[in-house]
């Protein structure tokens, strides 16, 4: 799991998702997109599934720290095969920009996984249910793919 979080909202969302993944028996390797030493994390191409979490910058853009992580991963030849994307955003800036980074990342990685978009900080039963349902859907989609390595259980 790679997370870019400005205010902590996306980080908290990632922690909640990681908890659901661990509860389902998956190993979760956590990395901040702007980590000074990314060598401690599992290489992106070694993970069965990479979960990318991002906040959205001005006008629906992907923040620079996530772009830098993607560029560094590509330079090392570690483009992940399977990517699911989640993020937080604010509708006050307009629906056309709301969680724009999520959509951009999905397009960039040609992800077939459903997106998860949460308004600001995840809270309450409605968000908890949406997060649990999304995580279950992502894991079900992962298990349905023909090229997944079901023995390693790395997310």
Regions found by a protein language model. Give the residues of each.
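Short acidic loop-to-helix transition motifs that present clustered carboxylates
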Residues: 32-39
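Cofactor-binding loop segments of dinucleotide-utilizing enzymes, especially the Rossmann-like FAD-
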Residues: 3-6, 33, 88-90
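Flexible, glycine-rich phosphate/dinucleotide-binding loops
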Residues: 8, 37, 92
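N-terminal beta1-alpha1 ligand-phosphate binding loop
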Residues: 1-22
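FMN-binding flavodoxin-like domain, especially the glycine-rich phosphate-binding loop
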Residues: 12, 20, 24, 29, ...
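Short glycine-biased active-site loop of nucleotidyltransferases that positions the nucleotide triphosphate
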Residues: 40-44
């Amino acid at each position: 799991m790679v997370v870019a979080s400005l205010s902590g909202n996306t980080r908290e969302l990632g922690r909640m998702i990681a908890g659901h993944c661990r509860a389902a028996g998956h190993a979760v390797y956590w990395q901040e997109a702007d980590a000074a030493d990314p060598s401690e994390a599992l290489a992106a191409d070694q993970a069965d599934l990479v979960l990318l979490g991002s906040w959205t910058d001005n006008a629906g853009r992907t923040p620079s720290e996530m772009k830098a992580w993607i560029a560094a991963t590509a330079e090392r030849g570690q483009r992940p095969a399977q990517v699911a994307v989640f993020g937080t955003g604010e509708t006050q800036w307009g629906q056309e920009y709301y969680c724009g980074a999520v959509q951009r990342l999905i397009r960039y990685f040609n992800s077939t996984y459903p997106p998860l978009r949460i308004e600001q900080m995840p809270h309450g039963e409605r968000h908890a249910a949406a997060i649990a349902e999304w995580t279950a859907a992502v894991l079900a989609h992962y298990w349905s793919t023909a090229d997944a390595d079901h023995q390693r259980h790395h997310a």
